[in-house]
Structure formats: C-alpha cells, structure tokens
Design a protein with these regions (language model features):
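Glycine-rich, charged/polar anion/phosphate-binding loops
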Residues: 45-48, 55-65, 84-91, 128-131, ...
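Short coil/turn connectors at secondary-structure junctions
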Residues: 9-11, 71-73, 98-103, 171
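Glycine-rich phosphate/pyrophosphate-binding beta-alpha loops
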Residues: 19, 23, 75-90
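ATP/nucleoside-binding phosphotransfer catalytic cores, i.e., glycine-rich phosphate-binding loops
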Residues: 63-65, 95-100, 107-171
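A residue-level signal for conserved active-site and pocket-lining positions in enzyme catalytic cores
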Residues: 26, 76, 105, 157
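Catalytic core of DAGKc-family lipid kinases
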Residues: 1-68, 72-74
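Gly/Ser/Thr-rich active-site loops/lids in small-molecule metabolic enzymes
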Residues: 34-44, 81, 86-115
Length: 171
C-alpha cells in the first residue's frame, strides 16, 4: 500500500517521499532553470541556496499525535523510501517494505549556514543522523508538518508551490 499525502487540499499517493526544505527549494529553482531552456545543476543550486538564498522557516511536526516545534528548519521530509534527490540516504533506517507500514519523518534544524553546509554531504551516506543536535528522526503512520510561511516542497520530485502544511498517512 502506498502512503497518501494531502497538500493544498489535494490528496496524492507517493512512492518514495515528500520533501520540504532545501530540497523543495532546489526543485523550485531547478524547474525555473529547465523552463528557461538550460540544464539544472542541483548540487550548485543546493550550495547557493544553503549559503545565500534559502530562508529557513520554523515548523511544527506531529507524528502519531506527538507535536514538536523546530526553529530554522533546513529539511523536513517524510519518507517511505530510504533515498531521495539523486542518492541522498535521508532516512537510513526506513524500509519501504516495513510490515508495519511506517514512514519516517526527518527534520534538520537549528543550525547555521556553515554547520549545515559541513553536515549536508554526510546525507549521501546516511551519516547526518549522527548529528542529533540538528537532526531528528521519528517513525509513524500519521505525520503532519506545518510551516510558519509558504514554501515549496516536492512529492517524488514533482514541485508543489506555496505550501504551509502537508499531511501524510502511511499505506
């Protein structure tokens, strides 16, 4: 069974994940570059975004009824799969075939630009989770993420703009 996500009043199924934060920003910027007829370099977009353009919102994340509030959120994806964005192991312990059907909420938060830029490459090996002061992982069947201002997110790589809230129901 595939998980469902409700965004801007629309319900969709997804296979891998719902990404909010710098990844949604990268998809938004990448879409604009591709629409202009150029090739998007997502690594370059991410680095420039981390250093100069992406503005970290605050968010509240509720997993199975337990709400936590986060300041300066860099990432807040909810994953059915383990990887996204060209090989980033964002949810290292997530099992797509989990018999319980859980999804994983990952929040990278609270850090400054340079610390985030230093830790960000460790996502490719799933080692970012060692930075518990700025990365929190929670598993559940019902996840709601709310932001303090509209932002872009991606659902299996498809960009959705002006989102202030998304809700995931595990399959």
């Amino acid at each position: 069974n595939l998980p469902r996500v409700v965004v801007n009043g629309e319900e969709r199924l997804f296979i891998n994940g719902v990404g909010y934060g710098i990844d949604g920003y990268c998809c938004e910027v990448g879409d604009k570059i591709v629409a202009s007829g150029k090739e998007a370099n997502y690594t370059s977009i991410a680095i420039k975004g981390l250093l100069f353009h992406y503005k970290t919102p605050d968010a509240s994340v509720t997993v199975d009824g337990v709400t936590k509030k986060y300041k300066k959120v860099w990432l807040a994806p909810t994953m059915k799969g383990r990887y996204y964005g060209g090989g980033m192991m964002i949810a290292p312990k997530q099992n797509r075939d989990d018999p319980e059907g859980f999804v994983t909420s990952v929040v990278m938060f609270g850090s400054g630009k340079l610390k985030t830029l230093m830790v960000f490459p460790s996502i490719f090996k799933g080692e970012h989770v060692r930075h518990s002061e700025m990365v929190e992982i929670r598993k559940g069947k019902h996840v709601t993420v709310e932001f303090d201002r509209p932002t872009a997110l991606q659902i299996d790589g498809e960009t959705v703009l002006n989102v202030t809230r998304y809700e995931v129901f595990a399959g």
